[in-house]
Amino acid sequence: MADPLPIFAPDALDARIHDPALARAVEAAVRRADAERWVERLHDRDGTIWSEDPEVQARIANRLGWLDAPRDFGDQVPALEAFGEGIRAAGFTAAIVAGMGGSSLAPDVLADAFRDVAGWLTVRVLDSTDPAAVEAAWDGLDPLATLVIVATKSGTTTESLAFQADAWARIHAALRAAGERRESPADLMIAITDPGRSLEAIPHHDGLREVFLNPEDVGGRYSALTYVGLVPASLLGIDLDAFLAASLAMLARTHATAVADNPGAALGVTLGALWRAGRDKLTLVADPAVARVGAWLEQLIAESTGKHGVGIVPVAGEPLGEASAYRPDRVFVRLALDGAAPPAPTPAGTSAAELLEALAAAGHPVLRIRLADPIDLAGEFVRW
Protein backbone atom coordinates (compact mmCIF):
# COMPACT_ATOMS: atom_id res chain seq x y z
CA MET A 1 0.00 0.00 0.00
CA ALA A 2 1.32 3.46 -0.83
CA ASP A 3 2.73 5.78 1.84
CA PRO A 4 0.29 7.67 4.07
CA LEU A 5 -0.65 11.27 3.37
CA PRO A 6 2.49 13.21 4.39
CA ILE A 7 0.60 16.15 5.89
CA PHE A 8 -0.07 14.13 9.06
CA ALA A 9 2.46 13.14 11.71
CA PRO A 10 2.98 9.35 11.64
CA ASP A 11 1.48 8.91 15.11
CA ALA A 12 -1.52 11.16 14.39
CA LEU A 13 -3.20 9.53 11.39
CA ASP A 14 -2.23 6.90 8.84
CA ALA A 15 -4.30 8.08 5.87
CA ARG A 16 -3.82 6.42 2.48
CA ILE A 17 -5.47 8.76 -0.03
CA HIS A 18 -4.31 8.15 -3.60
CA ASP A 19 -6.83 10.42 -5.31
CA PRO A 20 -5.05 13.80 -5.74
CA ALA A 21 -8.29 15.78 -5.56
CA LEU A 22 -9.27 14.13 -2.27
CA ALA A 23 -5.78 14.64 -0.86
CA ARG A 24 -5.94 18.34 -1.74
CA ALA A 25 -9.38 18.62 -0.12
CA VAL A 26 -8.05 17.13 3.12
CA GLU A 27 -4.99 19.37 3.10
CA ALA A 28 -7.18 22.45 2.54
CA ALA A 29 -9.43 21.44 5.43
CA VAL A 30 -6.42 21.02 7.72
CA ARG A 31 -5.19 24.49 6.81
CA ARG A 32 -8.61 25.97 7.51
CA ALA A 33 -8.93 24.20 10.86
CA ASP A 34 -5.52 25.48 11.91
CA ALA A 35 -6.26 29.02 10.73
CA GLU A 36 -9.59 29.09 12.57
CA ARG A 37 -8.12 27.50 15.72
CA TRP A 38 -10.61 24.65 15.88
CA VAL A 39 -8.63 22.65 18.43
CA GLU A 40 -8.20 25.51 20.89
CA ARG A 41 -11.84 26.52 20.51
CA LEU A 42 -13.03 22.97 21.16
CA HIS A 43 -11.10 22.72 24.41
CA ASP A 44 -12.36 26.20 25.32
CA ARG A 45 -15.94 24.89 24.79
CA ASP A 46 -16.58 27.45 22.09
CA GLY A 47 -19.96 26.53 20.60
CA THR A 48 -19.44 28.85 17.62
CA ILE A 49 -17.48 26.06 15.94
CA TRP A 50 -20.77 24.31 15.22
CA SER A 51 -23.46 26.98 15.02
CA GLU A 52 -24.14 30.70 14.70
CA ASP A 53 -27.29 30.38 16.83
CA PRO A 54 -26.51 31.54 20.40
CA GLU A 55 -29.09 29.16 21.87
CA VAL A 56 -27.57 26.18 20.05
CA GLN A 57 -24.08 27.31 21.04
CA ALA A 58 -25.08 27.33 24.71
CA ARG A 59 -26.61 23.86 24.49
CA ILE A 60 -23.49 22.48 22.82
CA ALA A 61 -21.17 24.09 25.37
CA ASN A 62 -23.20 22.37 28.09
CA ARG A 63 -22.61 18.95 26.52
CA LEU A 64 -18.81 18.94 26.35
CA GLY A 65 -18.14 17.43 29.76
CA TRP A 66 -16.66 14.37 28.07
CA LEU A 67 -13.53 16.46 27.54
CA ASP A 68 -12.94 16.33 31.31
CA ALA A 69 -14.08 12.76 31.98
CA PRO A 70 -10.68 11.02 31.79
CA ARG A 71 -9.28 13.43 34.39
CA ASP A 72 -12.35 13.75 36.59
CA PHE A 73 -12.99 10.03 36.90
CA GLY A 74 -9.39 9.23 37.76
CA ASP A 75 -10.26 10.31 41.30
CA GLN A 76 -13.02 7.68 41.38
CA VAL A 77 -10.78 4.69 40.65
CA PRO A 78 -10.32 3.58 44.30
CA ALA A 79 -14.08 3.69 44.92
CA LEU A 80 -14.82 1.88 41.66
CA GLU A 81 -12.27 -0.82 42.41
CA ALA A 82 -13.75 -1.26 45.90
CA PHE A 83 -17.21 -1.51 44.36
CA GLY A 84 -16.12 -4.20 41.90
CA GLU A 85 -14.34 -6.18 44.60
CA GLY A 86 -17.37 -5.88 46.85
CA ILE A 87 -19.75 -7.16 44.20
CA ARG A 88 -17.48 -10.11 43.50
CA ALA A 89 -17.08 -10.86 47.21
CA ALA A 90 -20.87 -10.76 47.64
CA GLY A 91 -21.17 -13.77 45.35
CA PHE A 92 -22.30 -12.12 42.14
CA THR A 93 -21.09 -13.99 39.07
CA ALA A 94 -22.72 -11.94 36.31
CA ALA A 95 -24.10 -8.51 35.51
CA ILE A 96 -26.63 -7.30 32.98
CA VAL A 97 -26.43 -3.74 31.68
CA ALA A 98 -30.01 -2.62 31.02
CA GLY A 99 -29.71 0.38 28.73
CA MET A 100 -30.16 1.73 25.24
CA GLY A 101 -27.81 3.42 22.79
CA GLY A 102 -25.11 5.41 24.53
CA SER A 103 -25.85 3.75 27.86
CA SER A 104 -25.21 0.26 26.53
CA LEU A 105 -22.81 0.34 23.58
CA ALA A 106 -19.59 1.24 25.41
CA PRO A 107 -20.22 -1.46 28.04
CA ASP A 108 -20.83 -3.89 25.17
CA VAL A 109 -17.43 -3.03 23.66
CA LEU A 110 -15.70 -3.69 26.97
CA ALA A 111 -17.69 -6.82 27.81
CA ASP A 112 -16.61 -8.36 24.53
CA ALA A 113 -12.97 -7.23 24.51
CA PHE A 114 -12.33 -8.19 28.17
CA ARG A 115 -14.60 -11.19 28.52
CA ASP A 116 -11.83 -13.61 29.50
CA VAL A 117 -10.45 -11.96 32.65
CA ALA A 118 -10.35 -14.90 35.06
CA GLY A 119 -12.26 -14.67 38.31
CA TRP A 120 -14.41 -11.69 37.37
CA LEU A 121 -18.02 -11.30 36.35
CA THR A 122 -19.62 -12.15 33.06
CA VAL A 123 -21.16 -8.92 31.77
CA ARG A 124 -23.98 -9.00 29.25
CA VAL A 125 -25.68 -6.04 27.64
CA LEU A 126 -29.41 -5.86 27.11
CA ASP A 127 -30.37 -3.17 24.59
CA SER A 128 -33.22 -4.75 22.64
CA THR A 129 -36.81 -5.23 23.73
CA ASP A 130 -37.19 -8.21 21.42
CA PRO A 131 -38.33 -10.98 23.81
CA ALA A 132 -35.82 -13.36 22.25
CA ALA A 133 -33.00 -10.92 22.98
CA VAL A 134 -34.14 -10.52 26.57
CA GLU A 135 -34.23 -14.28 27.06
CA ALA A 136 -30.81 -14.64 25.45
CA ALA A 137 -29.33 -12.09 27.84
CA TRP A 138 -30.62 -14.01 30.85
CA ASP A 139 -29.92 -17.46 29.45
CA GLY A 140 -27.88 -19.54 31.86
CA LEU A 141 -27.67 -16.83 34.52
CA ASP A 142 -28.76 -17.21 38.12
CA PRO A 143 -31.06 -14.24 38.88
CA LEU A 144 -29.86 -14.29 42.50
CA ALA A 145 -26.21 -13.99 41.44
CA THR A 146 -26.73 -11.40 38.70
CA LEU A 147 -26.34 -7.67 39.26
CA VAL A 148 -28.72 -5.58 37.15
CA ILE A 149 -27.30 -2.21 36.07
CA VAL A 150 -30.11 0.19 35.12
CA ALA A 151 -28.43 2.75 32.87
CA THR A 152 -30.48 5.77 31.79
CA LYS A 153 -29.33 9.38 31.60
CA SER A 154 -32.85 10.80 31.76
CA GLY A 155 -34.24 8.27 34.21
CA THR A 156 -37.21 7.84 31.90
CA THR A 157 -35.81 5.74 29.05
CA THR A 158 -38.71 3.43 28.26
CA GLU A 159 -36.59 0.45 27.29
CA SER A 160 -34.28 0.66 30.31
CA LEU A 161 -37.22 0.83 32.70
CA ALA A 162 -38.91 -2.07 30.90
CA PHE A 163 -35.74 -4.13 31.36
CA GLN A 164 -35.71 -3.17 35.03
CA ALA A 165 -39.33 -4.24 35.48
CA ASP A 166 -38.65 -7.56 33.77
CA ALA A 167 -35.55 -8.14 35.91
CA TRP A 168 -37.51 -7.24 39.03
CA ALA A 169 -40.08 -9.92 38.24
CA ARG A 170 -37.40 -12.54 37.55
CA ILE A 171 -35.51 -11.79 40.75
CA HIS A 172 -38.69 -11.64 42.83
CA ALA A 173 -39.74 -15.06 41.56
CA ALA A 174 -36.28 -16.49 42.25
CA LEU A 175 -36.27 -15.06 45.78
CA ARG A 176 -39.62 -16.60 46.55
CA ALA A 177 -38.60 -19.94 45.11
CA ALA A 178 -35.40 -19.94 47.18
CA GLY A 179 -37.16 -18.81 50.34
CA GLU A 180 -34.77 -15.89 50.68
CA ARG A 181 -35.55 -13.21 53.23
CA ARG A 182 -34.33 -10.26 51.22
CA GLU A 183 -37.01 -7.62 51.29
CA SER A 184 -36.62 -6.50 47.70
CA PRO A 185 -35.01 -7.32 44.36
CA ALA A 186 -33.53 -3.83 44.67
CA ASP A 187 -30.67 -5.47 46.59
CA LEU A 188 -29.53 -6.88 43.25
CA MET A 189 -29.87 -3.67 41.26
CA ILE A 190 -27.84 -0.49 40.82
CA ALA A 191 -28.44 2.58 38.67
CA ILE A 192 -26.30 4.90 36.57
CA THR A 193 -28.09 8.16 35.84
CA ASP A 194 -27.98 11.93 36.23
CA PRO A 195 -28.75 13.62 39.56
CA GLY A 196 -32.05 15.21 40.50
CA ARG A 197 -35.16 14.38 38.52
CA SER A 198 -33.38 11.72 36.46
CA LEU A 199 -32.65 9.69 39.58
CA GLU A 200 -36.07 10.32 41.07
CA ALA A 201 -37.75 8.96 37.93
CA ILE A 202 -36.21 5.49 38.31
CA PRO A 203 -38.54 3.07 40.09
CA HIS A 204 -37.29 1.95 43.53
CA HIS A 205 -34.37 4.39 43.26
CA ASP A 206 -34.23 4.92 47.02
CA GLY A 207 -33.77 1.20 47.71
CA LEU A 208 -31.23 0.23 45.08
CA ARG A 209 -27.97 -1.38 46.14
CA GLU A 210 -26.00 1.58 44.79
CA VAL A 211 -26.52 4.64 42.60
CA PHE A 212 -23.83 6.26 40.45
CA LEU A 213 -24.54 9.86 39.42
CA ASN A 214 -22.96 10.99 36.17
CA PRO A 215 -22.11 14.60 35.23
CA GLU A 216 -25.09 16.26 33.59
CA ASP A 217 -22.94 17.83 30.86
CA VAL A 218 -22.03 14.48 29.28
CA GLY A 219 -24.39 13.16 26.60
CA GLY A 220 -25.22 9.48 26.41
CA ARG A 221 -23.13 8.61 23.38
CA TYR A 222 -20.13 10.45 24.84
CA SER A 223 -20.32 8.70 28.22
CA ALA A 224 -17.91 5.77 27.68
CA LEU A 225 -15.35 7.18 30.14
CA THR A 226 -17.91 8.03 32.83
CA TYR A 227 -19.68 5.63 35.17
CA VAL A 228 -21.49 4.23 32.12
CA GLY A 229 -18.31 2.51 30.99
CA LEU A 230 -16.29 2.43 34.20
CA VAL A 231 -18.80 0.62 36.42
CA PRO A 232 -19.04 -2.36 34.02
CA ALA A 233 -15.25 -2.15 33.62
CA SER A 234 -14.85 -2.55 37.39
CA LEU A 235 -16.90 -5.76 37.23
CA LEU A 236 -14.91 -7.15 34.31
CA GLY A 237 -11.63 -6.89 36.18
CA ILE A 238 -10.18 -4.23 33.88
CA ASP A 239 -7.19 -2.37 35.30
CA LEU A 240 -8.90 1.00 35.73
CA ASP A 241 -5.67 2.90 36.33
CA ALA A 242 -4.24 1.62 33.04
CA PHE A 243 -7.55 2.16 31.26
CA LEU A 244 -7.85 5.80 32.28
CA ALA A 245 -4.12 6.32 31.69
CA ALA A 246 -4.67 5.27 28.08
CA SER A 247 -7.53 7.75 27.77
CA LEU A 248 -5.47 10.53 29.36
CA ALA A 249 -2.57 9.85 27.01
CA MET A 250 -4.86 10.25 24.02
CA LEU A 251 -6.51 13.32 25.55
CA ALA A 252 -3.11 14.95 25.95
CA ARG A 253 -2.36 14.31 22.29
CA THR A 254 -5.66 15.91 21.28
CA HIS A 255 -4.48 19.17 22.83
CA ALA A 256 -1.89 19.55 20.06
CA THR A 257 -3.00 22.77 18.38
CA ALA A 258 -1.76 21.73 14.92
CA VAL A 259 -4.29 19.37 13.37
CA ALA A 260 -1.52 17.41 11.66
CA ASP A 261 -0.16 16.40 15.08
CA ASN A 262 -3.52 15.75 16.74
CA PRO A 263 -5.02 12.22 16.41
CA GLY A 264 -8.58 13.32 17.13
CA ALA A 265 -8.59 16.47 15.04
CA ALA A 266 -6.75 14.78 12.17
CA LEU A 267 -9.39 12.05 12.03
CA GLY A 268 -12.33 14.44 12.33
CA VAL A 269 -11.07 16.96 9.81
CA THR A 270 -10.22 14.19 7.33
CA LEU A 271 -13.65 12.59 7.59
CA GLY A 272 -15.32 15.99 7.26
CA ALA A 273 -13.29 16.92 4.19
CA LEU A 274 -13.98 13.57 2.57
CA TRP A 275 -17.69 13.91 3.35
CA ARG A 276 -17.74 17.27 1.57
CA ALA A 277 -16.12 15.54 -1.40
CA GLY A 278 -18.94 12.98 -1.54
CA ARG A 279 -17.45 10.25 0.65
CA ASP A 280 -20.42 10.02 2.98
CA LYS A 281 -20.19 6.33 3.95
CA LEU A 282 -17.63 5.07 6.45
CA THR A 283 -16.92 1.35 6.49
CA LEU A 284 -15.17 0.04 9.60
CA VAL A 285 -12.96 -3.02 9.14
CA ALA A 286 -12.05 -4.24 12.62
CA ASP A 287 -10.28 -7.28 13.95
CA PRO A 288 -12.81 -9.69 15.52
CA ALA A 289 -11.26 -9.15 18.97
CA VAL A 290 -12.38 -5.50 18.93
CA ALA A 291 -15.25 -5.77 16.46
CA ARG A 292 -17.91 -4.58 18.92
CA VAL A 293 -16.43 -1.11 18.77
CA GLY A 294 -18.20 -0.92 15.41
CA ALA A 295 -21.66 -0.73 16.99
CA TRP A 296 -20.48 2.02 19.34
CA LEU A 297 -19.01 3.96 16.42
CA GLU A 298 -22.17 3.50 14.34
CA GLN A 299 -24.26 5.30 16.92
CA LEU A 300 -21.63 7.92 17.72
CA ILE A 301 -21.09 8.88 14.09
CA ALA A 302 -24.66 8.56 12.84
CA GLU A 303 -26.27 10.42 15.73
CA SER A 304 -23.58 13.09 15.94
CA THR A 305 -23.24 13.91 12.24
CA GLY A 306 -26.75 12.97 11.13
CA LYS A 307 -28.33 16.38 11.57
CA HIS A 308 -30.25 18.74 9.29
CA GLY A 309 -30.50 16.22 6.46
CA VAL A 310 -26.76 15.55 6.19
CA GLY A 311 -24.26 13.23 7.81
CA ILE A 312 -21.90 10.29 7.51
CA VAL A 313 -23.42 6.82 7.23
CA PRO A 314 -21.33 4.38 9.28
CA VAL A 315 -21.19 0.74 8.20
CA ALA A 316 -19.93 -1.90 10.64
CA GLY A 317 -19.96 -5.67 10.30
CA GLU A 318 -20.30 -5.66 6.52
CA PRO A 319 -18.07 -8.20 4.73
CA LEU A 320 -15.36 -6.39 2.81
CA GLY A 321 -15.72 -6.63 -0.97
CA GLU A 322 -13.66 -6.08 -4.08
CA ALA A 323 -12.97 -2.51 -5.19
CA SER A 324 -15.43 -2.86 -8.06
CA ALA A 325 -18.27 -3.40 -5.56
CA TYR A 326 -18.15 0.17 -4.26
CA ARG A 327 -19.19 3.53 -5.65
CA PRO A 328 -16.92 6.53 -5.07
CA ASP A 329 -18.71 7.40 -1.84
CA ARG A 330 -16.77 5.32 0.71
CA VAL A 331 -14.08 5.80 3.32
CA PHE A 332 -12.57 2.70 4.89
CA VAL A 333 -11.19 2.64 8.43
CA ARG A 334 -9.06 -0.33 9.43
CA LEU A 335 -8.93 -0.94 13.19
CA ALA A 336 -6.31 -3.56 14.05
CA LEU A 337 -5.18 -5.02 17.37
CA ASP A 338 -1.59 -6.20 17.67
CA GLY A 339 -1.41 -9.98 17.88
CA ALA A 340 -5.10 -10.48 17.06
CA ALA A 341 -6.55 -12.49 14.22
CA PRO A 342 -7.56 -10.34 11.23
CA PRO A 343 -11.01 -10.41 9.64
CA ALA A 344 -11.77 -13.63 7.80
CA PRO A 345 -10.74 -13.74 4.13
CA THR A 346 -13.30 -13.79 1.35
CA PRO A 347 -14.58 -17.14 0.03
CA ALA A 348 -12.00 -16.75 -2.73
CA GLY A 349 -9.24 -16.48 -0.14
CA THR A 350 -8.50 -12.76 -0.47
CA SER A 351 -7.37 -11.24 2.83
CA ALA A 352 -8.61 -7.97 4.30
CA ALA A 353 -5.13 -6.50 3.82
CA GLU A 354 -5.17 -7.36 0.13
CA LEU A 355 -8.67 -5.97 -0.32
CA LEU A 356 -7.78 -2.71 1.42
CA GLU A 357 -4.67 -2.32 -0.69
CA ALA A 358 -6.77 -2.76 -3.82
CA LEU A 359 -9.37 -0.31 -2.52
CA ALA A 360 -6.71 2.32 -1.83
CA ALA A 361 -5.18 1.78 -5.28
CA ALA A 362 -8.64 2.28 -6.79
CA GLY A 363 -8.92 5.70 -5.14
CA HIS A 364 -10.90 4.88 -2.01
CA PRO A 365 -9.48 6.58 1.12
CA VAL A 366 -8.19 4.06 3.67
CA LEU A 367 -7.44 5.19 7.23
CA ARG A 368 -5.57 2.84 9.54
CA ILE A 369 -5.59 2.72 13.34
CA ARG A 370 -3.54 0.19 15.28
CA LEU A 371 -4.02 -0.72 18.95
CA ALA A 372 -1.17 -2.25 20.92
CA ASP A 373 -3.51 -3.69 23.57
CA PRO A 374 -7.27 -3.86 24.27
CA ILE A 375 -6.70 -1.31 27.04
CA ASP A 376 -6.08 1.21 24.24
CA LEU A 377 -9.80 1.15 23.47
CA ALA A 378 -9.96 3.86 26.13
CA GLY A 379 -7.89 6.04 23.84
CA GLU A 380 -10.25 5.36 20.95
CA PHE A 381 -13.17 6.51 23.09
CA VAL A 382 -11.33 9.84 23.25
CA ARG A 383 -10.08 9.98 19.65
CA TRP A 384 -13.48 9.39 18.05
Where are these regions (language model features)?
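Extended, charge-enriched "interface" segments that sit outside catalytic cores
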Residues: 1-89, 339, 346-350, 354-357, ...
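Glycine-rich phosphate/diphosphate-binding loops that line cofactor/substrate pockets in enzymes
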Residues: 60, 79-93, 137-146, 270-279
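Glycine-rich oxoanion-binding loops at beta->alpha junctions
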Residues: 65-85, 108-151, 156, 163, ...
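Short glycine-rich or small-residue beta-strand-to-loop segments that form or flank ligand, phosphate
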Residues: 68-70, 93-99, 147-154, 190, ...
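Conserved phosphate/anionic-ligand binding catalytic regions in large, soluble enzymes, centered on
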Residues: 95-110, 222-229, 380
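Short helix-loop-beta junction
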Residues: 110-122, 170, 300-311
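Glycine/threonine-rich flexible loop motifs
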Residues: 157-164, 343-347
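Active-site phosphate/pyrophosphate-binding segments
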Residues: 173-333, 338, 362, 376, ...
